[in-house]
C-alpha cells in the first residue's frame, strides 16, 4: 500500500511539472509584438503653399488718407509677438523658390490695381499736345542747379468740357519723360502722352498715398512660418538655427530699382545672395550690414490746378512753378558709400576667385531699369546712379577710394506716367504734389547683374551693373529667411500597447487645428515629446479661436466698402482654411475611434517592412520629424489599416472583445490582471472575517442577555447538575432542567446556518424597532407641523383682517379730509366769485353816495 501511494504521488507530481515546463517554454518562446499607436499633437510639419493674411499696426497710417497698401483692412499686430526657438532642428530653405514671394508680388499688384479702380481714366488726354519749353516767370538766383532745358513742357490741348458737345482749350505742364513727339512732326512742337498707344492711363485718386507701411504676413491656424536665424545664411540650403513665428517682421513694400530702401540689415557682415553665381542672368541681391542714408528733394515750389474733363472727371496737373526751375536730386555720404562698396567687393571676390571687380552704370533699357526709380513724397523720382557705380577694384587692392567727405549728388528726373510693374496695357498717372518735396531713406541693399556668359576662367575682370525691375527680388530680399509649413499633428509609431477594450470612448474636450505653440518640442526625441502632448495641445483650439476672432473683426471693418480688399479676401480664405484643417483632423480621429485622445492605441500590428528599428532607437534617438521622413511612404497605408481595423471592431464588438481576452497566454500573467485577482481575494477574505466577527459579537450579545457568558462562540457546555439529579435513561426519560444547554451543532454549514439565522432575526427585530421609532417620530412631527401650520394660518388671517381694517379706516379718513378741504376750496372760490360779481354793484353804490 505504501509503494502504491508513493507511485501515485510521483505520477501526480510529474504531470504538474510537465504542465509548468510547457507553460514556461510557451512564455519564453513568445516575442513582444508591436502595435500601431496614434499620437495627436506631434511636432511634425511639411512644406506647403497656403494663403497668408496680413497684420499691420493700426497707428501706422493716417485714417484720413487711403494708402495704396490698404493696411486698414489688416488685423492688428500682436503687441507681444512670440518667437519659439526650436533646438536641435535643421531645416532646408530656398529663397528662390518661395511661394511667399510670389504671393506678396501678386498681392501688391492687386492692391495697386484695386486702389486705381475708382479713379479717373485719362483717355480724353490722348490727343495732340502743342508744347514748348517752359521757363519760370519770376526766376531768382540761388545755389541750386537749374533744370536742363526742355525738361518741362508747357502744352496746350483741346478737351471736352462738362457739356460733351463742346470743346475748350486748356494748358498743362508735362515732364519730358511723359510725352513723345509725333512721328511726322518736324518742328518738335506736337506731342502725345507716352503710353497712349499701348496702355490705359489711370490717374491716382487725390487722397491715395504711396508711403510704404510695414506689412506683416501671417500664417493661418494649422500652418506655421519657420524662420532661419543664421546670421550668414545665403538663402539656400540647411539652416541650423530655426525658430517658428506666427507672422513675419514688418516688411515695407518699397517699389524701387537698383537700390533697396528701408529694408532689413545683415547682423554681422555684408551678405550676397544669388540663385546661381555662375549664371550672369541671375540677379545678385546684396544685403548691407550698415545702412547708407540718402536724402532726396524736389526744390521746385509747384502749384496744382484742376482741369475738368467732362462730367464728374477732374484731371490734376502742375499749374505754375514759383521761383527757379531747379532739378530734383539726392545726396548721400561718399565715405559711407565707398566703404559699403569695399565690403561688397570683399564678398564678390570670394565667389569669383579674387578677380578684379568693376562697377559700371546700367547697360540700358527702360528708364525704370537705367535709373534708380522710387517714390518720394508722392512723386516718382528717376535718379542717375552713374556716380555710385563707376569704380574699379583691382586684385589685392582697396580700390580707388576718394578722400574727403563731400557728398555724392545724384541728379534726378521726375516722371508722372508710370508703367506699373512693367506690365503691358497698364499705366498710372501720379498727380503733382504741391510745394517742395523732401524725403529721407536708408539704402539697405543693392540689386546687381554681372556681364558675360557663364563664369570664364580666362578672364580676370568681372563687371557688375545695377539691376532691378523684377519686384520679386525686392520682396525676396526680405522674405529670404522665411518659409511656410503645414502642421501635421497626427503621428503614428510602434509601441507594445494594444487596444484591449473595444468600447465607445467618452468624448473629451475638443482640440483644434495645430498652432505654433507646440513646436518647442520639435528638436526633442520622440519619447520626450510624447510626454508633453497635453501641454503642446493646450493652445490648439484657443489659438484658432483667437485668430478667427481677429480675422472676423478685420473683415467687419470693411463692411462700409462696396467690395473687400485683397486682404479681406485672404482673411476669409484663412478662416475657411483653418476650420477645414481642424475638421479634417477631427474626422480622422473619429474614424479611427480616437476622438478626444492625445495617445490612442490600435489593434493594427506593426509591420517590420515599414521600419525595422527597435523601440529604443525610435523613441530615444529620433525626433518626430526624422521619424516622419522614415515612414512617409507608408503613412497612407497605415491610415487605411487603422480605419479598416476600427470598422472591423465596430462590426464585431462583442466577438472581438471575447477573443481578445484569449489572444495570447501572456495575458494570464498581465500585472493588471494579477492585481485584480489579489484585490478580489482580499475582499473575499476580509468579508468572511468581518462576517465572522459580526456573528461572534451578536452571539455574545444574545448570551449576555440570557444571563451568562459562554466559554466559546459556538460550543455551549451544559450547566452542572446536582448529584441527586439523574441524567436520564436510555429512553430519554427523566427531568430536564431549564439551564440545560441545547444540543451541540457540528459542521461548517450548520454553524453558518445558525449564525445566519441569528443575524437575520437580530436584523429583523432591530429594523422593526427602528421602523416603529421612525413612524412615531414622523407621526409626532406631522401632528406638530400641522398645528404649527394652522397657527400660522390663523395668524396670517388675523393680521390680514387687521391690515384690511386699517386700510379701510385710512381710506375713510383720507376721503373725509379730502372732502372737507374740497368743500372749503369750493366755498372760497364761491366767495371770490360773488365778490367779483358784486364789484359793479359796489361801484354803483359808491357813485350814488358820491353824487348825493
From Swiss-Prot:
Name this polypeptide is given: Envelope glycoprotein gp160
Gene Ontology annotations of biological process type: clathrin-dependent endocytosis of virus by host cell; fusion of virus membrane with host endosome membrane; fusion of virus membrane with host plasma membrane; positive regulation of plasma membrane raft polarization; positive regulation of receptor clustering; viral protein processing; virion attachment to host cell
GO molecular function ontology, one term from the record: structural molecule activity
Gene: env
Keywords: AIDS, Apoptosis, Clathrin-mediated endocytosis of virus by host, Cleavage on pair of basic residues, Coiled coil, Disulfide bond, Fusion of virus membrane with host endosomal membrane, Fusion of virus membrane with host membrane, Glycoprotein, Host cell membrane, Host endosome, Host membrane, Host-virus interaction, Lipoprotein, Membrane, Palmitate, Signal, Transmembrane, Transmembrane helix, Viral attachment to host cell, Viral envelope protein, Viral immunoevasion, Viral penetration into host cytoplasm, Virion, Virus endocytosis by host, Virus entry into host cell
Organism, as annotated: Human immunodeficiency virus type 1 group M subtype B (isolate BRVA) (HIV-1)
Region of interest (Immunosuppression), ranges: 570-588
Residue ranges that the Swiss-Prot or TrEMBL entry lists as coiled coil: 629-663
Site entry (Cleavage), positions: 507-508
Segments of this protein annotated with the region V2: 155-196
GO cellular component: host cell endosome membrane; host cell plasma membrane; membrane; viral envelope; virion membrane
Keyword Signal: yes
Glycosylation sites: 49, 88, 135, 138, 154, 158, 197, 234, 241, 262, 276, 289, 295, 301, 331, 354, 360, 384, 390, 396, 400, 442, 456, 607, 612, 621, 633, 670
Placement of sequence motif YXXL motif: 708-711
CDD domains documented for this protein: HIV-1-like_HR1-HR2
Stretches assigned to the Cytoplasmic side: 702-852
Pfam families membership: GP120, GP41
MPER: region residues: 658-679
Region of interest called V4, as start-end residue ranges on this chain: 383-412
TM regions (residue ranges): 681-701
Amino acid at each position: 500500500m505504501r509503494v502504491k501511494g508513493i507511485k501515485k504521488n510521483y505520477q501526480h507530481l510529474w504531470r504538474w511539472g510537465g504542465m509548468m515546463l510547457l507553460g514556461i517554454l510557451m512564455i519564453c518562446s513568445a516575442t513582444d509584438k508591436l502595435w500601431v499607436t496614434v499620437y495627436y499633437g506631434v511636432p511634425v510639419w511639411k512644406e506647403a503653399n497656403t494663403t497668408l493674411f496680413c497684420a499691420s499696426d493700426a497707428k501706422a497710417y493716417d485714417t484720413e488718407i487711403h494708402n495704396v497698401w490698404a493696411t486698414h483692412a489688416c488685423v492688428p499686430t500682436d503687441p507681444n509677438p512670440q518667437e519659439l526657438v526650436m533646438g536641435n532642428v535643421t531645416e532646408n530653405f530656398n529663397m528662390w523658390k518661395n511661394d511667399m514671394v510670389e504671393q506678396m508680388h501678386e498681392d501688391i499688384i492687386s492692391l495697386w490695381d484695386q486702389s486705381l479702380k475708382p479713379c479717373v481714366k485719362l483717355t480724353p488726354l490722348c490727343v495732340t499736345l502743342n508744347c514748348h519749353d517752359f521757363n519760370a516767370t519770376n526766376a531768382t538766383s540761388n545755389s541750386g542747379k537749374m533744370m536742363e532745358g526742355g525738361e518741362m513742357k508747357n502744352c496746350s490741348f483741346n478737351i471736352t468740357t462738362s457739356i460733351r458737345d463742346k470743346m475748350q482749350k486748356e494748358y498743362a505742364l508735362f515732364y519730358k519723360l511723359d510725352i513723345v513727339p509725333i512721328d511726322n512732326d518736324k518742328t518738335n512742337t506736337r506731342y502725345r502722352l507716352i503710353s497712349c498707344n499701348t496702355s490705359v492711363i489711370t490717374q491716382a485718386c487725390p487722397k491715395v498715398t504711396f508711403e510704404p507701411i510695414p506689412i506683416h504676413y501671417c500664417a493661418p491656424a494649422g500652418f506655421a512660418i519657420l524662420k532661419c536665424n543664421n546670421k550668414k545664411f545665403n538663402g539656400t540650403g540647411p539652416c541650423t538655427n530655426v525658430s517658428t513665428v506666427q507672422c513675419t517682421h514688418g516688411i515695407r513694400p518699397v517699389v524701387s530699382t537698383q537700390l533697396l530702401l528701408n529694408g532689413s540689415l545683415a547682423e554681422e557682415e555684408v551678405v550676397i545672395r544669388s540663385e546661381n553665381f555662375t549664371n550672369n542672368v541671375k540677379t545678385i541681391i546684396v544685403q548691407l550690414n550698415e545702412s547708407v542714408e540718402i536724402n532726396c528733394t524736389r526744390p521746385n515750389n509747384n502749384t496744382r490746378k484742376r482741369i475738368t474733363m467732362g462730367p464728374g472727371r477732374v484731371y490734376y496737373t502742375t499749374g505754375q512753378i514759383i521761383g527757379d526751375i531747379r532739378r530734383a536730386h539726392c545726396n548721400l555720404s561718399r565715405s559711407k558709400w565707398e566703404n559699403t562698396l569695399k565690403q561688397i567687393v570683399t564678398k564678390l571676390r570670394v565667389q569669383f576667385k579674387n578677380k578684379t571687380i568693376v562697377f559700371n552704370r546700367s547697360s540700358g533699357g527702360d528708364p525704370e531699369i537705367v535709373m534708380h526709380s522710387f517714390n518720394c513724397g508722392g512723386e516718382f523720382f528717376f535718379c542717375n546712379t552713374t556716380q555710385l557705380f563707376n569704380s574699379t577694384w583691382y586684385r589685392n587692392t582697396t580700390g580707388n577710394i576718394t578722400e574727403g567727405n563731400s557728398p555724392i549728388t545724384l541728379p534726378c528726373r521726375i516722371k508722372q506716367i508710370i508703367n506699373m510693374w512693367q506690365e503691358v496695357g497698364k499705366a498710372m498717372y501720379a498727380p503733382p504734389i504741391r510745394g517742395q518735396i523732401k524725403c529721407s531713406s536708408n539704402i539697405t541693399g543693392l540689386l546687381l547683374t554681372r556681364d558675360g556668359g557663364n563664369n570664364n576662367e580666362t578672364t580676370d575682370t568681372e563687371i557688375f551693373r545695377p539691376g532691378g525691375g523684377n519686384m520679386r527680388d525686392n520682396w525676396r530680399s526680405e522674405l529670404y529667411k522665411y518659409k511656410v509649413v503645414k502642421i501635421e499633428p497626427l503621428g503614428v509609431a510602434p509601441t507594445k500597447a494594444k487596444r484591449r477594450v473595444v468600447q465607445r470612448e467618452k468624448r473629451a474636450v475638443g482640440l483644434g487645428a495645430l498652432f505654433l505653440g507646440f513646436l518647442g518640442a520639435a528638436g526633442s526625441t520622440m519619447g520626450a515629446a510624447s510626454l508633453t502632448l497635453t501641454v503642446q495641445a493646450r493652445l490648439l483650439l484657443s489659438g484658432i479661436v483667437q485668430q478667427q476672432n481677429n480675422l472676423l473683426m478685420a473683415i467687419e471693418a470693411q463692411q462700409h466698402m462696396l467690395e473687400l480688399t485683397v486682404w479681406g479676401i485672404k482673411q476669409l480664405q484663412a478662416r475657411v482654411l483653418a476650420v477645414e484643417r481642424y475638421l479634417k483632423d477631427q474626422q480622422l480621429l473619429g474614424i479611427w475611434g480616437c476622438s478626444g485622445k492625445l495617445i490612442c492605441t490600435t489593434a493594427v500590428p506593426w509591420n517590420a517592412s515599414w521600419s525595422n528599428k527597435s523601440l529604443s532607437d525610435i523613441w530615444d534617438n529620433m525626433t518626430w520629424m526624422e521619424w516622419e521622413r522614415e515612414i512617409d511612404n507608408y503613412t497612407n497605408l497605415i491610415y487605411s489599416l487603422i480605419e479598416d481595423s476600427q470598422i472591423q471592431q465596430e462590426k464585431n464588438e462583442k466577438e472581438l472583445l471575447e477573443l481578445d481576452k484569449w489572444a495570447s497566454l501572456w495575458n494570464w500573467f498581465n500585472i493588471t490582471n494579477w492585481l485584480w485577482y489579489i484585490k478580489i481575494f482580499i475582499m473575499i477574505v476580509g468579508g468572511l472575517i468581518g462576517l465572522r466577527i459580526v456573528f461572534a459579537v451578536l452571539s455574545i450579545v444574545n448570551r449576555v442577555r440570557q444571563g451568562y457568558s459562554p466559554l466559546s462562540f459556538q460550543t455551549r457546555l451544559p450547566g452542572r447538575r446536582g448529584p441527586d439529579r439523574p441524567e436520564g435513561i436510555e429512553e430519554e426519560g427523566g427531568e430536564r432542567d431549564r439551564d440545560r444547554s441545547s444540543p451541540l451543532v457540528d459542521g461548517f454549514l450548520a454553524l453558518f446556518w445558525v449564525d445566519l439565522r441569528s443575524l437575520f432575526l437580530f436584523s429583523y427585530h432591530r429594523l422593526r424597532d427602528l421602523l416603529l421609532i421612525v413612524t412615531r417620530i414622523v407621526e409626532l412631527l406631522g401632528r406638530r407641523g400641522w398645528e404649527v401650520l394652522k397657527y400660522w394660518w390663523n395668524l396670517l388671517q388675523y393680521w390680514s383682517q387687521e391690515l384690511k381694517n386699517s386700510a379701510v379706516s385710512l381710506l375713510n379718513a383720507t376721503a373725509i379730509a379730502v372732502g372737507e378741504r374740497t368743500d372749503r376750496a369750493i366755498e372760497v372760490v364761491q366767495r371770490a366769485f360773488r365778490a367779483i360779481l358784486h364789484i359793479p354793484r359796489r361801484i354803483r353804490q359808491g357813485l350814488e353816495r358820491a353824487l348825493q
